[in-house]
């Protein structure tokens, strides 16, 4: 995407993204629409802007657009919030089985992040994941058939199985962390 396209998306998002009225601690107000948690990320807002543009083109009323943005719970295994356990946010983005999807998930994740990467690779270059981690508080735990390649690319910790990765994430993630399952790989090697 070019900077010109980014500007166009931002302008469109400003025009159609649901928001609300928020009062800051200093008493100042922020007005506009805010979406539900499932769409509360840069890519979620971009997706909503695109959907709202199409809906408006089709003549769907503004009130329905607002309600849809507020009520949308997301899709299973696509940045699905599993819950907050032990002071950590657990997110299932197991449909992120390619590098581009993982980069987008990392872009949206609130730091610090512990990302679980691994499984059976698809022959992709993992360097874009390392680039997306650069300068951010992200720890990778890498498992499965491509675990070694992912650990090498990201500087992450290598383990054998997804179950081990989950245990280590649970035990080592700092309070307030996001634990993100976005494997960049298929899971065929993890289940028999």
Predicted regions and their residues:
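Active-site beta-alpha connecting loops in nucleotide-dependent enzymes
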Residues: 75, 94-162, 186-192
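Acidic, Mg2+-coordinating active-site environments of NTP-dependent enzymes
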Residues: 1-90, 151-152
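Short amphipathic alpha-helix with an adjacent loop that forms part of the alpha/beta core around
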Residues: 130-131, 167-172
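Short beta-strands and strand-loop turn motifs
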Residues: 3, 180-184
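Glycine/Thr-rich phosphate-binding loops that ligate phosphate moieties of nucleotide
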Residues: 165, 173-178
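Short linear capping/connector segments at secondary-structure termini
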Residues: 85, 184-186
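Short coil/turn connectors at secondary-structure junctions
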Residues: 18-20, 77, 85-87, 109-113, ...
């Amino acid at each position: 995407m070019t900077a010109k396209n980014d500007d166009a998306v931002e302008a469109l998002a400003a025009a159609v993204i649901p928001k609300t009225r928020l009062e800051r601690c200093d008493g100042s107000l922020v007005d506009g629409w805010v979406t539900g948690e499932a769409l509360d990320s840069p890519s979620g807002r971009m997706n909503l802007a695109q959907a709202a543009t199409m809906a408006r083109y089709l003549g769907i009323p503004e009130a329905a657009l607002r309600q849809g943005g507020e009520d949308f719970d997301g899709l299973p295994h696509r940045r699905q919030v599993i819950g907050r356990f032990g002071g950590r946010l657990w997110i299932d983005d197991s449909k992120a089985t390619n590098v581009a999807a993982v980069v987008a998930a990392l872009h949206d994740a609130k730091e610090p992040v512990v990302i679980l990467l691994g499984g059976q690779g698809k022959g992709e270059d993992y360097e874009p994941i390392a680039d997306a981690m650069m300068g951010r508080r992200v720890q990778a735990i890498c498992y499965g058939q491509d675990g070694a390649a992912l650990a090498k690319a990201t500087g992450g910790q290598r383990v054998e199985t997804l179950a081990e990765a989950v245990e280590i994430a649970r035990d080592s993630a700092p309070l307030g962390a996001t634990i993100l399952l976005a494997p960049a790989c298929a899971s065929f090697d993890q289940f028999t």
